[in-house]
Amino acid sequence: RSTLSFFKPVLQKNSTVAWQNTLRQQGEILSRLRELDVALMTCEKIKLQAAASGGKLTVPTQVEELLQKLRVEETAACLQKADLSIMTKTLAQFSIWLHERPLASNLADKKIRKFISRRLNEWSEKLETIDRKYPDFHNMLELHQIRIKIKRFRYALQTLPEVPRDSNLLRRLKRLQDMLGFLHDDFINAKLVQCFLEDAGNVQLRYEAGLFAGWERAKAEAAVEMLPQLWEDFCGALNAWRKANL
């Protein structure tokens, strides 16, 4: 999807947008399942820490059981939506579409290296100024948008053989992406158990849900405070790479 987005300007517009939507819908089928898997992994981490503490930390048993139930239900829903034969047919059709070279008529004769350089320059400039569009690093919805664009840029750098590699830039990019991913997972974990916190009839469940939601809160808050410096370091490395290679 990231590569398709990268080459979108030189592809036939209507069919490219249609394929972007199709691939996005396929990816979204498993998004809820991934969120539940991350939440259950958090339960495992809490259990390990509880064991190491000698029983001083409460294990969120009820929260884990409810999350497991939700995962079973979501798995069944995914198996209904993600029919293997349909997905295989879709990917085969996508492959055929690519082999037919669906280039936009006015760009079909352009040199690929020139296009890649210009496109990377465009994406780099947008990344360097994205904090003006999303200035609040405490806003998780804005951070999610930044994370998507960071991830897309990293995939482009690592996928295209024509792109000059820079280990310093990739290292800073990966660190920033991991930090944003951790903050997103912490935010989603808290949202997943919000309904448990509102269960007035189950005091133990509310307690466990509060423990679960706040388990890595201090770490998340510290990460948010580190983001401006991480962002500045990344932008500095990106600017240097862009000037040297584009």
Regions found by a protein language model. Give the residues of each.
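Cationic, histidine-enriched alpha-helical/coil surfaces that engage anionic ligands
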Residues: R1-L246
